[in-house]
Amino acid sequence: SCSCQKHFSCCD
């Protein structure tokens, strides 16, 4: 449940 964030690989 992650939005487009550059913290993790959520925003591929």
UniProtKB/Swiss-Prot annotation:
Aspartic acid 1-amide modification, residue list: 12
Cysteine-cysteine disulfides: 2-10, 4-11
Tissue and organ expression note: Expressed by the venom duct.
Keyword annotations of the record: Amidation, Disulfide bond, Secreted
Entry protein name: Conotoxin pc16c
GO cellular component: extracellular region
Top-level taxonomic group: Eukaryota
Localization of this protein: Secreted
Free-text note regarding domains: The cysteine framework is XVI (C-C-CC).
Signal peptide: none
